[in-house]
């Protein structure tokens, strides 16, 4: 079972915590993580691109010229695909890009990412993370005290913390139920509180 140090908001040691080995100590499955990332990004696609085919383009009801006798190639409509202003063949139509993925696989992907963070020493655990008011400077001080730099993903349900993180470049704050594979992979450091760990273990156990 992984045992990590807990630090307080001033950067001082506040004890240790035992992490669930089945969540924070498994062998990462890169293939499942890749599938989860593709699925999440695909689900965000708007899927509204569309073009008109020959039946949707206005006009073209009359035959341009008679079938025979002109010496030109026969034509039935000025909105056929070969005409300028004609309809498009096999163009995009509105569709959903959402992909299905078994719940077990989605959970395995999240476990793999969390386990990789532990293996790379990129998981920082705070005893708590609360602010009395939205103060960017205070949140930055807490991260500096924890010796956290680079791209940081902070998991917190505190509204003041969420507001404080909006003005910090390379810092993103998400609620516990908003923790996802794409953000966890995109941001190098992951900051969790003890309460967040308990809730994550309840969901993924």
UniProtKB/Swiss-Prot annotation:
UniProt feature, compositional bias: Basic residues: 60-71
A Pfam family reported for this protein in Swiss-Prot or TrEMBL: Ribosomal_L4
GO terms of biological process kind: translation
Alphabetical UniProt keywords: Ribonucleoprotein, Ribosomal protein, RNA-binding, rRNA-binding
A single GO cellular-component term on record: ribosome
GO molecular function: rRNA binding; structural constituent of ribosome
Residue ranges of the region described as Disordered: 45-97
General function of this protein: One of the primary rRNA binding proteins, this protein initially binds near the 5'-end of the 23S rRNA. It is important during the early stages of 50S assembly. It makes multiple contacts with different domains of the 23S rRNA in the assembled 50S subunit and ribosome.
Self-association and partners: Part of the 50S ribosomal subunit.
Stated family: Belongs to the universal ribosomal protein uL4 family.
NCBIfam families: rplD_bact (TIGR03953)
Protein name: Large ribosomal subunit protein uL4
């Amino acid at each position: 079972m992984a045992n990590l140090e807990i630090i307080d908001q001033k950067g001082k040691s506040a004890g240790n915590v035992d992490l669930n080995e089945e969540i924070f100590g498994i062998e990462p499955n890169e293939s499942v993580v890749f599938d989860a990332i593709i699925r999440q990004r695909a689900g965000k696609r708007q899927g509204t691109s569309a073009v008109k085919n020959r039946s949707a383009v206005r006009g073209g009801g009359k035959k341009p010229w008679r079938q025979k006798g002109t010496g030109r190639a026969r034509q039935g409509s000025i909105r056929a695909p070969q005409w300028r202003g004609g309809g498009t063949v096999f163009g995009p139509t509105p569709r959903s890009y959402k992909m299905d993925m078994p719940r077990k696989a989605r959970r395995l992907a999240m476990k793999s990412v969390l386990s990789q963070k532990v293996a790379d020493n990129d998981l920082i655990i705070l005893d708590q993370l609360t602010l009395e008011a939205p103060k960017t400077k205070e949140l930055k001080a807490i991260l500096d005290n924890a010796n956290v730099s680079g791209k940081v993903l902070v998991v917190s349900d505190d509204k003041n913390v969420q507001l404080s993180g909006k003005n910090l470049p390379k810092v993103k704050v998400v609620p516990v139920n908003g923790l996802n594979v794409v953000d966890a992979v995109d941001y190098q450091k992951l900051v969790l509180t003890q309460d967040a760990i308990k809730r994550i273990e309840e969901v993924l156990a």
